[in-house]
Amino acid sequence: MAASLIVEAGRLVLCDQATADLAGAKATLSADLRELSQQADLILVFGGDGTMLRVAREVAGSNTPILGVNVGGLGFLTAVSSEQLPRALACVWSGDFVFEQRSLIEAGVQTHEKIVQQTALNDFVVSRGTVPRLVELEVGVDDAVLTRYRCDGLIVSSPTGSTAYSLAAGGAIVSPNAEVFTLTPICPHTLSNRSVIVSLNSVVRVKVLSRRVETVLSADGQVQTQLSAGDTVEIRRSQRAVSLLRLVGSSFFETLRQKLHWSGSNL
């Protein structure tokens, strides 16, 4: 349906190679995601937030806006449902939209084997692996030590990621335009440990102290790197961002009311 709506409006449809193969499209109309982001005026992503996160990392730094169409689950990042797509595209053609720049975050870690760099839109998580034992982490912000955690893990989320894993672990909901990191421990052994909010311009350092517990770094819950005792993960704001398209009249707070079933959903 989406392709026909776009063609009827006199626009050209491009798709990434994997989608082209799945749909049986001609190879001349396909490109990899990075190449596509340089050629297209708008990227349509069909799926849930997981699909949006993957695409955002792959096209990071591109100025091409992304419009997410939710055919998955909760969908905080997917702006419209499949039923709303015809109206949404009509709004796009008429210019009834705004761009939202979402900062990405980066993590760098020098393991015993190599230097690893990862990018995320939502969050980085340093956590235990498959064995259900507490990990011990030392956390610092810039040049200051924050604390040591004995916990299942630590979530360092961007403003965009505040409604993801961090929210489920008791973290605060943060407006996407707030320039902050949210540091949320997962099941900390010290009951007074709570979510901490620091500037997005800070560098958050997480040092692995545990020697007998498998520890991993996860980017957006999708890309994992094995960590060892003594490894330090440095998380900072990326110089790259992604542009999400939002229809005029919609807002982050409207999304909260609808997705979380808060009072006022019918306003």
What is the meaning of each model-derived region?
Residues 45-49, 56-58:
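N-terminal glycine-rich "phosphate-gripper" loop used for MgATP/nucleotide binding
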Residues 54, 59-69:
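Gly/Ser-rich helix-loop-strand patches that form or flank binding pockets
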Residues 1-42, 83-98, 109-118, 248:
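ATP/NTP phosphate-donor binding region
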Residues 134, 147-192:
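Gly/Ser/Thr-rich active-site loops/lids in small-molecule metabolic enzymes
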